[in-house]
From Swiss-Prot:
The protein, known as: mRNA-decapping enzyme 1B
Catalyzed reactions: a 5'-end (N(7)-methyl 5'-triphosphoguanosine)-ribonucleoside in mRNA + H2O = N(7)-methyl-GDP + a 5'-end phospho-ribonucleoside in mRNA + 2 H(+)
Compositional bias (Low complexity): 252-261, 371-381
Keywords from the named record: Acetylation, Cytoplasm, Hydrolase, Nonsense-mediated mRNA decay, Nucleus, Phosphoprotein
Modification N-acetylalanine, positions: A2
Pfam families registered for this protein in UniProt: DCP1, mRNA_decap_C
Start and end residues of each stretch annotated as Disordered: 195-222, 243-266, 362-426
GO terms, molecular function: 5'-(N(7)-methylguanosine 5'-triphospho)-[mRNA] hydrolase activity; enzyme activator activity; mRNA binding
Sequence ranges of Polar residues compositional bias: 205-219
UniProt entry tagged with the keyword Transcription: no
Intracellular or extracellular location(s): Cytoplasm; Nucleus
Record family assignment: Belongs to the DCP1 family.
Native source species: Homo sapiens
């Protein structure tokens, strides 16, 4: 009875195992023999040693209803990957107790380790018999084992699929343990793999070499590098440290750079992307940020000399402006202390007020205030210091020309060392400057504000003809903000001027040559329109509370909106903008231009600063 019960349990176990095997291969119909515990080893040809795989479990030898008629499978206990091998005439078995070695048709050598030596010998004998049987059938050329593949097309397809799957699995496991580098054929493996180190070619390909001109064919110093800032015309502060060519070669340089960028905007970017190094970027021309009408004005007028450098593009030697056409080292008098604690709002306010005084300094502007205040004296010094060909300063007026003389003839004071560090981010003004005062319009090469206003009105009319697709106010207003200085350069100027006598001549001596290159038409609204107009009494000017020159913000705001009073009447009149055009232009500039928004914010800070000053009074 015990033997019958044991046989029943074994039979039930075989049935369960057969059902499990049929889930993987439905053509298995009978289990021939079983080995309870085996482990699979593979032989490494390079290391010439055996390596254990992750296949370990029960070995089943079975028969199939399709070809091949026999096979064995190791049901893996460690993972879901089982080892299946069909028994064909190509298998070669060798017994080395407790290992059963075999070599398959792909010449891969495996070793099966048996926990029970008796099972090892029994399974080895069974394998040899089945292999000899397959070899005998193949030698005879006829037999029932080959007929399903040849005669029955449906079973033949299933057998072929099974063989393909087994072969693919064997190749996968073989390649998985192999350490040889394999060729990458999938594009996703190349582009989506973060650990893949891509080689950097020393040269571009032949097609790129043919398409891209050599550096000696163009006058650009580095034509093979095209940065995004140069492509989209954005000013980069890193260009302040580059050396700029003289202004007389501006038109040739601009035409060559524009022709080169029209021909090769994308291919240069391809070559640029092959390098990990950041190339030295040269300053882009300012025409990239200007509207076409301003460019025409710069090209046509013989008296106006457009600058190849703005304050953002030329390296500032000592962070100061120029007087009488010469470079002097700083706006501070020798020995003047640094006022480090100047507030940020005062600096922003002075930067905004500095913008409006460029078009405001008319002959009558110097006589608005009391002569005893520093502002008119500084205006007088302004008119004397803006002669374009003068090398030595004119006779000092009320003692305000003495600091420039000290810097022409003296040395740099120790306080300007930190000033020079800030100055690298901002450029110095050009040697030749145009006067603002109307008394010097008769000199050669000098344009009065009236003539400049006429030219700007001509530009406005030309711009209105081409303004069908965009608002009339989109005349590159942010460039005007950039030319007035951004960020840090004015901070050092304010920090180093403790009193009004030193601040006033500094913020009024500004080169008017920035105006033809960057100014919008005369009807362009300034940011000061949005600020609350406040009148400042002369007492506040004398007490030194104003951060900039002593002229009221309302006068500065209206000077940009109204034509400058001139002795000769203005012939050309311009029509004002409609309310819709003004609304569209302001919305466009606020949404798309950060510099325009910064100017409005600076004007707001300026008004808040003045309100705070009045409260302190």
């Amino acid at each position: 009875m015990a033997a019958v019960a044991a046989g029943g349990l074994v039979g039930k176990g075989r049935d369960i195992s057969l059902a499990a095997l049929q889930r993987h291969d439905p053509y298995i119909n009978r289990i021939v023999d079983v080995a309870s515990q085996v482990a699979l080893y593979t032989f490494g040809h390079r290391a010439n040693e055996w390596e254990k795989t992750d296949v370990e479990g029960t070995l089943f030898v079975y028969t199939r209803s399709a070809s091949p008629k026999h096979g064995f499978t190791i049901m893996n206990r460690l993972s879901m990957e089982n080892r299946t091998e069909p028994i064909t005439k190509d298998l070669d078995f060798q017994l080395q107790d407790p290992f059963l070695l075999y070599r398959n048709a792909r010449l891969s050598i495996y070793g099966i380790w048996f926990y029970d030596k008796e099972e090892c010998q029994r399974i080895a004998e069974l394998m040899k018999n089945l292999t000899q049987y397959e070899q005998l059938k193949a030698h005879q050329g006829t037999g029932a084992g080959i007929s399903p593949v040849i005669l029955n097309s449906g079973e033949g397809k299933e057998v072929d699929i099974l063989r393909m799957l087994i072969k693919a699995k064997d190749e996968y496991t073989k390649c998985k343990t192999c350490s040889e580098p394999k060729k990458i054929t999938s594009s996703s493996a190349i582009y989506d793999n973060p650990n893949l180190i891509k080689p950097i070619p020393v040269k571009p390909s032949e097609n790129q070499q043919q398409r891209i001109p050599q550096p000696n064919q163009t006058l650009d110093p580095e034509p093979q590098h095209l940065s995004l800032t140069a492509l989209f015309g954005k000013q980069d502060k890193a260009t302040c440290q580059e050396t700029v060519e003289p202004p007389q070669t501006l038109h040739q340089q601009q035409q060559q750079q524009q022709q080169q960028q029209e021909k090769l905007p994308i291919r240069q970017g391809v070559v640029r992307s092959l390098s990990y190094e950041e190339p030295r970027r040269h300053s882009p021309p300012i025409e990239k940020q200007l509207c076409p009408a301003i460019q025409k004005l710069m090209v046509r007028s013989a008296d106006l000399h457009p600058l190849s450098e703005l304050p953002e593009n030329r390296p500032c030697e000592n962070g100061s402006t120029h007087s009488a056409g010469e470079f002097f080292t700083g706006p501070v008098q020798p020995g003047s202390p640094h006022n480090i604690g100047t507030s940020r709002g005062v600096q922003n306010a002075s930067r905004t007020q500095n913008l409006f005084e460029k078009l405001q300094s008319t002959p009558g502007a110097a006589n608005k205030c009391d002569p005893s205040t520093p502002a008119p004296a500084s205006s007088a010094a302004l008119n004397r210091s803006r002669a374009p060909t003068s090398v030595t300063p004119v006779a000092p007026g009320k003692g305000l020309a003495q600091p420039p003389q000290a810097y022409f003839n003296g040395s740099l004071p120790p306080q300007t060392v930190g000033h020079q560090a800030h100055g690298r981010e901002q450029s110095t003004l050009p040697r030749q400057t145009l006067p603002i005062s109307g008394s010097q319009t008769g000199s050669s090469g000098v344009i009065s504000p009236q003539e400049l206003l006429k030219k700007l009105q001509i530009v406005q009319q030309e711009q209105q003809l081409h303004a069908s697709n965009r608002p009339a106010l989109a005349a590159k207003f942010p460039v005007l903000a950039q030319s007035s200085g951004t960020g840090k350069p004015l901070e050092s100027w304010i920090n180093k001027t403790p009193n009004t006598e030193q601040q006033t001549p500094l913020f009024q001596v500004i080169s008017p040559q920035r105006i033809p290159a960057t100014a919008a038409p005369s009807l362009l609204m300034s940011p000061m329109v949005f600020a609350q107009p406040t009148s400042v009494p002369p007492k506040e000017r004398e007490s030194g509370l104003l951060p900039v020159g002593g002229q009221e913000p309302p006068a500065a705001a209206t000077s940009l909106l109204l034509p400058i009073q001139s002795p000769e009447p203005s012939v050309i009149t311009s029509s004002p903008l409609t309310k819709l055009q003004l609304q569209e232009a302001l919305l466009y500039l606020i949404q798309n231009d950060d510099n325009f928004l910064n100017i409005i914010y600076e004007a707001y800070l300026f008004s808040m600063t003045q309100a705070a000053m009045k409260k302190t009074m």
